[in-house]
């Protein structure tokens, strides 16, 4: 997911699915959402994100890893729910 957006290889449909998954993540776990926003969209490193959020780098790395996996699962579930065009 992360690589695709930065390379411009993500489809419009996937961007919509990602946006919906991010909204769900924000409601579910705001800290993970913030880690994703800083790492992915702001381009901060683990260390920079940790400093910005007053967390340890290990915590940020764990939250980042979990959030990416969760987002991919959510997007896949949403993709399966969509009717075929």
Labelled PLM ranges:
Residues 76-85:
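Short, basic, alpha-helical segments at the C-terminal edge of helix-turn-helix-like DNA-binding modules
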Residues 34, 42-62:
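Helix-turn-helix DNA-binding module
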Residues 5-37, 44:
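Amphipathic alpha-helical segment used for protein-protein interaction
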Residues 1, 38-39:
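Short acidic/histidine-centered micro-motifs embedded in hydrophobic/aromatic stretches
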Residues 53-77:
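DNA-recognition helix of helix-turn-helix
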